[in-house]
Amino acid sequence: MTGNEQKFSLQGKVAIVTGAGSGIGRETALCLANAGANVVVAEANETTGKETAAKVSAQTGSRGLFILTDVSRSESVQAMVIATIEAFGRLDIAVNNAALHPDASPIAELHEDHWQKIIGVNLVGVAFCLKWELQQMIQQGGGGSIINISSATINRPQEKMSAYIAAKHGITGLTQTAAVENGRHGIRVNALAPGGVATDLTMATMQELGLTEENEAARSSLFKRFAKPEEIAQSVLWLASDAASYVTGATIAVDSGLSLI
């Protein structure tokens, strides 16, 4: 193994990926596993979560473990972290990816229950995950990398996405605060802000908003296409690895230049 390969290796490490039942989460779980990490698939959908864990175990040299998790409930996240330690003994990497799609209504007509549900998963859920992940990393002596998944909409807001965008802005604040508080423990906390990604969630959102992939890709990408989920996963791998050892508190755009358009 060369020096560069060693920096990207996650051999012997343990990772949690929330919302890993599909899309970015699933590809991230597979990517981290291919780099050598054992991966906990923390997912609210038992069927898709078990599918991802099975793929990790079957397609990589690592172990995948599904744990049913509702990130909007602190006790569920705590139980998931405890189960991770019982299974693998430690926690080195956490990717807080679980999210609900936008509410598809303007602010003046927002559906209050759905708005609160989105905030509960997309923002409060990240806070709960950070709480229990950080406690475990500190308890085991420090070190580790946490990656929160934000969105390019923090720089390029769109109509009818108020709860989603508000939550993603909140992730920036959580990321920066967690980085400041935990640098002394050697824990790095960063966020990725993807642009358009070809996932089931993206397709469902566009359908609700009356948008098409062709038009949105042409409008929102210098490459005139959406990202593949695995392209986002590769950026997660970099932040998770020692190759990004001096990076913390950052929200990094992975958006094919959307923020420049």
UniProtKB/Swiss-Prot annotation:
Superkingdom, natural source: Eukaryota
Functional description taken from the UniProt entry: Short chain dehydrogenase/reductase; part of the gene cluster that mediates the biosynthesis of astellolides, drimane-type sesquiterpene esters that show antimicrobial, anti-inflammatory, and anti-tumor activities. The first step in astellolide biosynthesis is performed by the sesquiterpene cyclase astC that catalyzes the formation of drimanyl pyrophosphate from farnesyl pyrophosphate. Drimanyl pyrophosphate is then dephosphorylated by the sesquiterpene phosphatase astI to produce drimanyl monophosphate which is further dephosphorylated to drim-8-ene-11-ol by atsK.
UniProt keyword NADP present: yes
Protein name: Short chain dehydrogenase/reductase astE
GO biological process, one term: terpenoid biosynthetic process
The encoding gene: astEA
Record InterPro entries: NAD(P)-bd_dom_sf, SDR_fam
Xref: Gene3D superfamilies: NAD(P)-binding Rossmann-like Domain (3.40.50.720)
Enzyme Commission designation: 1.1.-.-
Organism of provenance: Aspergillus oryzae (strain ATCC 42149 / RIB 40) (Yellow koji mold)
